[in-house]
Amino acid sequence: MKLKTTLLGKTYVFQSVKEVLAKANEEKTGDKLAGLAAESAQERVAAKVVLSALTLGDLRENPAVPYGTDEVTRIIQDDVNEAVYRKIRGWSVAELREWILDEKTTSSQIRHLSRGLTSEMVAAVAKLMSNLDLIYAAQKMPVTATCNTTIGLPGTLSCRLQPNHTTDDPDGITASVLEGLSFGAGDAVIGLNPVTDSPEQVGKVLRRFQEIKERWEIPTQICVLAHITAQMKAVKAGAPCDLIFQSIAGSEAGNAAFGFNADTVAQARELLLRDGTAMGPNVLYFETGQGSELSSNAHHGTDQVTMEARCYGFAKRFQPFLVNTVVGFIGPEYLYDARQVTRAGLEDHFMGKLTGVSMGCDCCYTNHMKADQNDIENLASLLTLAGCNYFMGIPHGDDIMLNYQTTGFRETAALREITGKTAIAEFQQWLEKMGFSENGRLTAKAGDGSSLLF
């Protein structure tokens, strides 16, 4: 294993695989904050050169966090298909990149090979790709999952309807839900971030969602994005629930900071498969985002792209229906501007798809970040080309409860029309039955949620 290279007469020496991974990263303020970033563009290129020559075996043998001290590492390593890994362990990261991008390499071949990868390998190959590489590669890797409906099929683009409200008022929530449905949002999930994180409030909102779903016979999923334990208590108390949600991190310490561990997730999955309202096998929803481990001092000296890839390795164990990065939510301390947010969104989507999870993206930014709505529309457009499974849908893209900006109802509708994609088939049929869509396009009735009331 060679950890040095000479460029233009200057020799660059790296002390570990972890340092190579960090310094090969595209520029991120979070890595600078952690003291891990390359000090110059030249050092970044040198790290990429070294990384390109490392073998997949080198990366397997040097996980970001030791196996003996971290359950996320154990999950990632234990879930590797050893027969597949043995065939590729001698490949360099550069060879893996070339193989994925080769036009002769098929989706099924990539899916099979991905079973032999660890998250560090996934992160490594992402670091050697341009933005267009990430888009081209990701669109070769469709990933589907089934709850009440099946998400991720080619030709579809889905949307989470996010009817957040500042006081969790049921009527206010309902108004946002009906408006979103009329725009074609909500086929991925109708999912609310509650103000009050209690089992009682979770149950109250879930029952309202279930009433809406049953009254208008909507083929979709419902979820309230409270803490995982609050949702479990609500389900045990009899609340209807299709999906249980949790934010996840790429280390055991990061998950502990969120207040859960792998056993908690396993118990939630078992509970929902037994007592939930979903018809399919995929009953979990995870959110991630570059930099969350650093914010809880749980990054173990590892760069934020590698830690993000480890989130997907953890998620895969539990066969989720939905996984999405909330790409610009943490702020400029981790992703400084639109350029960094765009890069992170493309990286995250590619890494999730290569890992094998049903990957979406909350294309978003905070008010103090150097980004605006045009930048977020740019990212959503690029991710649509990349085959992203779903985006968020919030009234006018302005979340008045979480106080950040993301995509609205109209963006997904426009992107579907531009690319010839539709909502999930059963939901698309419902839209046409209700008069909101005709021949794959929204009608004049779209946007009038009150039409569902009369």
What are these model-predicted stretches?
Residues 1-174, 182, 189-454:
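Anaerobic metallocofactor- and corrinoid-dependent redox/one-carbon enzyme cores
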